[in-house]
Amino acid sequence: MTVKETIMKKLLTSAALALTLTTAGMTSYAVNWVYLGQDGNDRIYYDTSSVSRQGNLVAVTMQEREADGEAEEYNYLFDTHRKKYTLASKIEYDRNGNVKKIETFHESDFGWKKVKENSEEELLYKQIVNKPATASL
């Protein structure tokens, strides 16, 4: 690994950690959920107020609402130059909105994955990549 790659990895890891710390607490106050589509019985939304951008990195919160009323919320970090993403955190809610489980991830845990065609991540990526951010990281 070159020095440049090591520095980039450290910067991306720091950005992912900053995303986790700043958006995990904010998402419970989100009021701008926009419908993205269906995944089986789940309805997918993203929070327009959570979109933040720093250079080629875009942070966003997505939520999957299940038919039984439970929900899962994901905090993503997208690298728009490489068309890749990593997951910073996942929060599971019961049908009453109570938190069941919180997971946070480091880049080394989840890694950077390519945005695949026809995936939830691609749907989200297409929505945020060309839209102005409401905040910066």
Locate predicted features.
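Intrinsically disordered, low-complexity and often Lys/Arg-enriched segments
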Residues: 2-3, 29
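Bacterial N-terminal signal peptides that target proteins for export
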Residues: 3-15
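Hydrophobic helical h-region of N-terminal Sec-dependent signal peptides
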Residues: 13-21, 25
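N-terminal secretory-pathway/extracellular module detecting exported/lumenal segments
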Residues: 26-137
